[in-house]
């Protein structure tokens, strides 16, 4: 019966150990946040801010407990931001709201993401007055046990156009 020399047995065991260790380490490697996850969160965040959804507290699913935004030259925690948006919709008598994003730039790692973009918002009032606003915005997102969430937003209004009703 042929027996492998002791050195070859040790070498084979070492190779198996290295292979097992490599497989284990690869399975433990965390994946970076993807651009698709970032865009999905941004879309969901603004869907939650839609005039039809704002009162539902849907936004809470997409933000961290310590979320805040810098908007209208003020730092606002979630509660204050909800009041700000609600009052803005009421003052404009908003019937519909929509946003379109352009010039999107995303940077990610395994635990977080940063996005900057131009946000073009259109708000139609019940009196058919169209308000178009353009913002330069940036957001910081973090991985949580519940998935990717918005932790911070910065929003700077760079243009506003109001088109009166043609009635």
Located regions from the model:
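A solvent-exposed, acidic/Ser-Thr-rich amphipathic alpha-helical stretch
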Residues: 55-56, 60-108
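Hydrophobic/aromatic beta-strand elements that line small-molecule binding cavities or substrate pockets
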Residues: 85, 101-106, 119-121, 136-142
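Short beta-strand edge/turn micro-motifs at domain boundaries
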Residues: 134-165
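A short hydrophobic beta-strand element
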Residues: 111-121
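Short, low-complexity N-terminal intrinsically disordered segments enriched in polar/charged residues
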Residues: 28-56, 60-61, 166-167
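Sec-dependent N-terminal signal peptides
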Residues: 17-26
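Short, cysteine-centered beta-strand-loop-beta hairpins and adjacent loop/turn segments enriched
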Residues: 91-95, 122-131
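Short, Lys/Arg-enriched N-terminal segments with co-localized hydrophobic residues
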Residues: 2-13
